[in-house]
């Protein structure tokens, strides 16, 4: 059992170590080149901050996977699974490049979206595919020709959803770390090592990045930028497809939507609100969940912790729904944490209203 876990432990540890060591270097380069996120009325920070931290997350995750490959650990995968792992890795690289180009050159929204749809389509071609969905009162449905557009929408949609929640220090990295760990556990339970290997590396990189991106007593030293957020979002969406949806059961088909419910529901809510008001869905505003929590009187730090708890809660429900033996226990613990977080938020809002 321990021997079987070694590739995943090594992937996690290598990625975390590389991100921990390279982030200060990347930060210095970003400041020297002037690649910084400047304060504005829509943003929460007050001072310019380097915004290319995604470089270190990508380097750590990619290097960990390459080392695992050189050590021969991809040999545990059947050939189609190896294609899928490279499809997610290379697709993540291209999404990272799109975001990094946006960090440098401020690309138009429609141009970014077109490039993302093309890359997501290429990922579908190499086997990163949603082939089934579950419908109420119908059950599991084979998508057939609809597999391509639905997969492309999922991959590009989650990438943008993670980018949109990257509005408070540590938020996107922490949510991504929790989601990646949940996908790691479910993928191992469902015997999907390809997704588990990427999830292990991704979660390690995200947790190490929090060392510089989430400071309880002072502002973040560096932001991940669009490059990092797009990379995390695409990779999470990709591994949820190859690691969970590929297991053809009703439970497996709906698990990705539960695990990634926080960024997904936030994005859908904001898009429909903008369209309802006659606005472009690409126009930035302050309607995201983290904006609403802060506006209600919750501190930025507690808003982040609340969304962490929410992500952990839906993840625990996914573990319970997956059918694993301890799933009910995980869900109970996650629910208790969520209830406590709700009480803390309610208490802070109440104190603010009475002051």
Give residue spans per PLM region:
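"…together with the soluble PPM/PP2C metallo-phosphatase catalytic core" -> "…together
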Residues: 1-267
């Amino acid at each position: 059992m321990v021997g079987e876990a070694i590739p995943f432990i090594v992937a996690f540890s290598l990625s975390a170590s590389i991100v921990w060591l390279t982030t200060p270097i990347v930060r210095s380069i970003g400041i020297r080149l002037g690649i910084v996120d400047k304060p504005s009325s829509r943003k929460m920070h007050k001072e310019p901050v380097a915004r290319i931290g995604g470089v270190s997350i990508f380097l750590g995750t990619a290097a960990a996977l390459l080392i695992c490959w050189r050590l021969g650990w991809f040999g545990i995968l059947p050939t189609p699974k190896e294609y899928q792992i490279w499809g997610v890795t290379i697709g993540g690289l291209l999404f990272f490049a799109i975001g990094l180009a946006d960090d440098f050159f401020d690309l138009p929204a429609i141009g970014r979206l077109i490039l993302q749809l093309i890359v997501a389509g290429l990922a579908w071609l190499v086997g990163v595919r949603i082939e089934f969905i579950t419908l109420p009162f119908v059950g599991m449905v084979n998508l057939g020709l609809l597999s391509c557009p639905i997969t492309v929408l999922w991959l590009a949609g989650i990438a943008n959803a993670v980018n949109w929640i990257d509005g408070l220090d540590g938020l996107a990295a922490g949510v991504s770390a929790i989601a990646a760990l949940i996908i790691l556990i479910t993928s191992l339970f469902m015997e999907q090592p390809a997704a588990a290997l990427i999830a292990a590396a991704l979660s390690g990189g995200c947790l190490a990045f929090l060392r510089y991106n989430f400071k309880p007593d002072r502002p973040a030293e560096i932001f991940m930028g669009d490059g990092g957020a797009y990379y995390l979002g695409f990779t999470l969406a990709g591994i949820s497809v190859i690691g969970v949806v590929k297991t053809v059961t009703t439970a497996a088909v709906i698990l990705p939507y539960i695990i990634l419910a926080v960024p997904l529901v936030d994005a859908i809510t904001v898009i429909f609100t903008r369209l309802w008001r006659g606005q472009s869905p690409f126009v930035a505003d302050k309607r995201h969940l983290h904006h609403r929590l802060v506006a209600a009187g919750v501190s930025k730090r507690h808003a982040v912790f609340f969304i962490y708890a929410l992500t952990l809660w839906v993840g625990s429900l996914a573990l319970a729904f997956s059918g694993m033996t301890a799933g009910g226990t995980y869900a109970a613990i996650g629910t208790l944490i969520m209830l406590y977080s709700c009480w803390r938020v309610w208490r802070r809002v109440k104190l603010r209203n009475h002051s």
